[in-house]
From Swiss-Prot:
The gene is uppP. It comes from Deinococcus radiodurans (strain ATCC 13939 / DSM 20539 / JCM 16871 / CCUG 27074 / LMG 4051 / NBRC 15346 / NCIMB 9279 / VKM B-1422 / R1). This is Undecaprenyl-diphosphatase. It is found in: Cell membrane. One of its GO terms (biological process) is response to antibiotic. It is a multi-pass membrane protein. GO terms for molecular function: undecaprenyl-diphosphatase activity. Pfam families: BacA.
């Protein structure tokens, strides 16, 4: 059955990693509702490592764009873009190094994740209800100041598990004047170093833990995550070009309430997830 659990985890990760609905919240539901019999440390490490598949999907989807980095020496747009990505990563790196263990110890609880989903959904609805005219329509035109601010917004997902890294970075970008497609694309780019670094570090540190379920099952999860995420990226980009995020806002609230109901009924334990 391990292969089936790996497949399901990969599907859930691939769908939810880049959509603003919290992969953390959905992986919690998946693991608990399916009663996955893996030790907790295996489950936690597996969930992080298969993010590598989703990150690879971004690299493949945008491979032509990423190749433009070859011209960074004389292309001002590429210089602005990658300076922005580096600056946007700084707040998350600092926060993760200083407080990562504390956050995992005290904040990774289903109830915390549920309220993050609900509050994030409400904020998403309110942001989409305001009348504002975006002033940035290309990721190469994002200023250094805006990039750093988006990186700070992304930290909300670290401080409040379940808020969603993609949601916090996309909403932060929109609040700063990026249009939806531009904010979404920059969030994808930002996820490469942020999530890729975490996945690689966990893989290096925890190879012995992952050995408990075998390299084949890890590969199944990562490959499935890659394939599903690739199509999820394309779908989301098409969606945001003509739609707003209010549907995601409602969905987040529904999932958050569902988690709270499951906790109240004893189906889902509210102990620490870290």
């Amino acid at each position: 059955m391990d292969w089936l659990y790996s497949l399901i985890y990969g599907i859930v990760e691939g769908i939810t990693e880049f959509l603003p609905i919290s992969s953390t919240g959905h992986l919690i539901l998946t693991g608990n509702l399916l009663h996955v019999p893996w030790p907790k440390e295996v489950k936690d490490t597996f969930e992080v490592v298969i993010q590598g598949g989703a990150i690879l999907a971004v690299l493949v989807y945008y491979w032509r764009d990423f190749l433009k980095i070859r011209h960074i020496g004389h292309d001002r747009g590429q210089q602005r873009l990658w300076l922005g990505v580096v600056l946007a990563c700084i707040p998350a790196v600092i926060l993760g190094v200083l407080f990562g263990d504390t956050i995992k110890a005290y904040l990774f609880r289903p109830s915390v994740v549920a309220w993050a989903l609900i509050v994030g959904g409400v904020l998403m609805w309110l942001l989409e209800s305001r009348k504002a005219t975006p002033d940035t329509h290309d990721i190469e035109n994002i200023s250094a100041g805006k990039a750093l601010a988006i990186g700070a917004a992304q930290c909300l997902a670290l401080l409040w598990p379940g808020f969603s890294r993609s949601a916090s970075s996309i909403l932060g970008g929109m609040l700063l004047g990026l249009d939806r497609p531009t904010a979404t694309k920059f969030s994808f780019y930002l996820g490469v170093p942020t999530l890729g670094g975490a996945a690689l570090l966990d893989f290096i540190k925890s190879r012995e833990i992952l050995a408990q379920i075998g390299v084949v099952n890890v590969a199944i999860g990562a490959v499935t995550s890659f394939v599903v995420a690739y199509f999820a990226i394309g779908w989301l980009l098409r969606f945001v070009s003509t739609n707003n995020f209010k549907g995601f806002a409602v969905y987040r609230v529904v999932v958050g309430v569902l988690i709270l109901v499951l906790i109240a009924r004893g189906v889902l334990q509210n102990g620490s997830l870290a």
